[in-house]
A protein has these predicted regions:
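Aromatic- and glycine-enriched pocket-lining scaffold segments that form the walls
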Residues: 25-44, 62-63
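Beta-propeller domain segments
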Residues: 43-214
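Loop/turn elements at helix/coil->beta-strand transitions in domains of secreted/extracellular proteins
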Residues: 13, 34-37, 117-119, 200
Length: 214
């Protein structure tokens, strides 16, 4: 936002989330059309989420978080919980959680409402070794469980421990390792130069170099 101003003299507020392994960090932040900050976190790393963190309500890893960072400078926490977060005030799940069951969300986008979009969120979630997936979340549809580690794509994976809650929400699209190796989420096209046939389509890529649209 070109009108934003930052005061570098302010003491930075830091929040740390312990990562048990070095991979699956998520690594993406995005503001939604509601003005809240969405934070996609991976499951903490290693293979097949050995501690089942993406399905553990008391853990932030393997989740999509949603927070309000529009707080006064003197607010020591640095953020607040939006009043309509789905698990706010619950007995077990963390208040910051918006959705469960992500392995390594890389990356996600919101359908731009200023250009005729719906405000929906689309998430590219990197798979373990069989399937890459694209998850679609209509605007405001909170509290979903995208299934990892019990599900990889729309397929059963490691099921010896239960989902935090169900039923899981399957992806709108998944693909196997014969087509790619690691999804990179993209954007819903709302421009005009590519023609009307491409408007509203979701463009995404894979580490192998391929680009698709849905």
């Amino acid at each position: 936002n070109p009108s934003s101003r930052f005061d570098l003299r302010l003491e930075p507020t830091r929040r740390f989330i312990e990562q048990p392994f070095s991979n699956h960090n998520g690594g993406h932040l995005a503001f939604g059309p509601d003005g809240y900050l969405y934070i996609g976190l991976g499951d903490g790393g290693s293979g097949n989420d050995p501690d089942h963190l993406a399905q553990t309500p008391a853990e932030l890893l393997g989740k999509m978080l949603r927070i309000d960072v529009n707080v006064p400078n003197e607010d020591a926490s640095g953020y607040r919980i939006p009043p309509d977060n789905p698990f706010l005030g619950g007995n077990s799940a963390r208040d910051e959680i918006w959705a469960f069951g992500l392995r390594n969300p890389w990356r996600y986008t919101f359908d731009d409402v200023t250009r005729g979009g719906t405000g929906a969120m689309v998430i590219g979630d990197v798979g373990q070794n069989r399937f890459e997936e694209i998850n679609y979340e209509p605007r405001g549809r909170s509290g979903r469980n995208y299934g990892w580690r019990n599900r990889e794509g729309a397929h059963d994976n490691v099921t010896n421990r239960p989902l935090a809650y169900g039923p899981p929400t399957d992806p709108i699209f998944d693909y196997g390792r014969s087509d790619g190796v690691s999804v990179t989420g993209g954007f819903i096209y709302r421009g005009t130069r590519l023609g009307a046939a491409h408007r509203g389509r979701y463009f995404f890529a894979d580490y192998s170099g391929r680009v698709w649209s849905l």
